[in-house]
């Protein structure tokens, strides 16, 4: 009986999610022309939608997965427009919600609060915002979730391979998360089938061959995305965790402070290590300093870039958040997860010179689904927190406008 009620709640919840999101979607469409990278993505998507596969904008640095999906919806040229291209991501966001709940039920069991937790992940402010734009983030995450479910439930090895290929074609760096899932499942001996193992190994090997052939993980504008050792990206990810897991951070603050007090030597060593890293390895990308359409621009220019001491003053927060994160993982912090996850997060983030909130989405979602079993009160608090952040985000987007000399329409601020 609970199973039936749970399914009905899920269907009702997804219906409400789409109904509310469609209202926001139409307002975003009416209020904006191409948003930042959509300047490249939308014309490329329209070209593929119209079956013009010879057109390619060299400013694009990802493989054409997003645009190939656009070619599928282009059964009629009437659908080859910004509206319908963006709509694909909105539909995908609802599928993400469904997969969130599926995975969380497997981890925590079938409880009502798990449904709400799935909605919280779908409403994660940066992820939710990009569900209304023609960016790769939503579909990229969908492909990773689908791949994870296929391995989790030991689906057909060919299906695992197909999901993995789709994931990489949508975003090359997804190969890192495929490697993480593979590493985790191998360490746990979940994948019993040698064929399943071979399917992932074949995918990993094929991707390595592509990188060698291409000379880079990036296609298109390689100069803007040169691999650079940038370890502080891990610290910025901790700040991302601190903001979007604030209810969980506050809930375990006393426990974390007690742990730090009992491990003073370890805390001092972390402080010394982190101070050394930020001193010698803080990197500024030219785009970060020049593009005032992202929140990271304002954070950097009003704190990190404005005061010489800021990068050092932030180190205690990094150390606290690291201990706090470990505290929130608790019984989920097994070595079979933490080892491949930490290595893959380092590879995915610390070779990126540019600080982009989008880069933190997949590692955060993976981590968030491993938190210790939350209370209903905590899940509800998180929902309220995300609602407030989303409200502020869209308020700024709709009301804060400014002109750039190279554009004849107003620019807006996004994540």
Predicted regions: what they are:
Residues 10, 14, 264-276, 338-345, ...:
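Signature aromatic-anchored transmembrane alpha helix within multi-pass, membrane-resident enzymes
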Residues 87-108:
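Transmembrane-helix motifs of polytopic, lipid-linked glycan transferases
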Residues 117-119, 126, 145-151, 157-172, ...:
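Membrane-interface alpha helices of multi-pass inner-membrane proteins
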């Amino acid at each position: 009986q609970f199973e039936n009620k749970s399914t009905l709640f899920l269907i009702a919840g997804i219906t409400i999610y789409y109904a509310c999101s469609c209202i926001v979607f139409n307002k975003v469409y009416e209020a904006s022309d191409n948003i930042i990278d959509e300047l490249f993505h939308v014309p490329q998507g329209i070209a593929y939608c119209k079956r013009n596969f010879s057109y390619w904008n060299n400013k694009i640095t990802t493989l054409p997965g997003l645009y190939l999906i656009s070619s599928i919806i282009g059964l009629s040229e009437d659908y080859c427009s910004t509206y319908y291209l963006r709509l694909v991501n909105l539909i995908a966001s609802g599928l993400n919600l469904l997969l969130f709940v599926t995975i969380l039920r497997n981890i925590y069991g079938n409880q009502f609060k798990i449904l709400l937790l799935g909605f919280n992940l779908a409403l994660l402010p940066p992820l939710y915002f990009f569900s209304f734009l023609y960016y790769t983030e939503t579909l990229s995450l969908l492909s990773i979730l689908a791949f994870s479910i296929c391995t989790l439930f030991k689906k057909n090895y060919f299906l695992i391979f197909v999901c993995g290929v789709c994931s990489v074609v949508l975003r090359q760096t997804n190969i890192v998360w495929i490697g993480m899932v593979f590493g985790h499942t191998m360490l746990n001996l979940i994948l019993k089938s040698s064929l399943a193992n071979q399917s992932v190994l074949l995918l990993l090997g094929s991707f390595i061959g592509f990188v060698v052939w291409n000379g880079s993980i990036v296609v298109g504008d390689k100069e803007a995305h040169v691999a650079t050792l940038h370890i502080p990206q891990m610290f910025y990810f901790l700040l991302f965790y601190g903001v979007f897991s604030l209810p969980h951070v506050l809930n375990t603050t006393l426990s974390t402070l007690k742990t730090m007090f009992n491990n003073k030597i370890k805390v001092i060593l972390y402080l010394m290590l982190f101070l050394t890293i930020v001193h010698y390895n803080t990197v500024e990308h030219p785009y970060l300093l020049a593009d005032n359409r992202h929140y990271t621009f304002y954070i950097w220019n009003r704190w990190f870039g404005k005061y010489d001491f800021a990068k050092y003053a932030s180190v205690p927060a990094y150390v606290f958040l690291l201990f706090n994160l470990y505290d929130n993982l608790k019984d989920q912090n097994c070595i079979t997860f933490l080892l491949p996850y930490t290595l893959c997060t380092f590879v995915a983030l610390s070779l990126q010179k540019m600080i982009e909130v989008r880069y933190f989405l997949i590692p955060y979602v993976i981590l968030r689904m491993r938190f210790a079993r939350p209370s209903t009160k905590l899940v509800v608090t998180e929902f309220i927190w995300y609602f407030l952040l989303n409200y502020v985000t869209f308020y700024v987007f709709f009301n804060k406008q400014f002109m750039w000399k190279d554009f004849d329409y107003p620019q807006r601020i996004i994540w």
